[in-house]
């Protein structure tokens, strides 16, 4: 039965995708079936507009973003940081992605995923699937399609998209592909 606290995508996973994966891959136990663990969202924007970016992404994701800092200030490892190298080069892009991030879990994760899947499936957006994660980089043009910030996008025009990493409990890339295809087939 559909509970008002559950998202349609979460209901679809529990009632359709999970039993389907159990039969397709022939697991011995239903707890072996891959599931979504978390979604990590990292916005791309200039560092001086990080407050506007955090606000926009909090509106879209439904959860507060945490401010992060670089882990070190000197040493060899700092030289290989591509963002620091961009700041020192003549061809500076001015966009950093490590200043704010959010990790979505539970109902908030499924609410965000429902909006994301709707946009991705409509525009046939490419994703990169690895062993236990699904990665995609959303452009600014697709960010405008989120209904929460659609009418007030001029306030958030400095956002240059965001990176999304969907972490699953899958053990192989094939399991991750099957899980992701189950979410994309859902008509929302």
From Swiss-Prot:
| Molecular function via GO | structural constituent of ribosome
Q: What is the lineage of its organism?
A: Eukaryota, Viridiplantae, Streptophyta, Embryophyta, Marchantiophyta
What keywords sit in the KW lines? Mitochondrion, Ribonucleoprotein, Ribosomal protein
Family that this chain belongs to? Belongs to the universal ribosomal protein uL5 family.
**Primary place of residence?**
mitochondrion
List the subcellular locations: Mitochondrion
Any one GO CC term of this protein is:
ribonucleoprotein complex
The source's domain of life comes to Eukaryota
Query: Would the keyword DNA damage turn up in this protein's UniProt record?
Result: no
GO BP term, example? translation
**What stretch or stretches form a coiled coil here?**
none
Task: Tell me what this protein is called.
Answer: Large ribosomal subunit protein uL5m
Q: Which Gene3D superfamilies does the record match to this protein?
A: 3.30.1440.10
Q: Tell me which InterPro entries the record gives.
A: Ribosomal_uL5, Ribosomal_uL5_C, Ribosomal_uL5_CS, Ribosomal_uL5_dom_sf
| PANTHER family, sorted | 60S RIBOSOMAL PROTEIN L11-RELATED
Query: What gene name is listed for this protein?
Result: RPL5
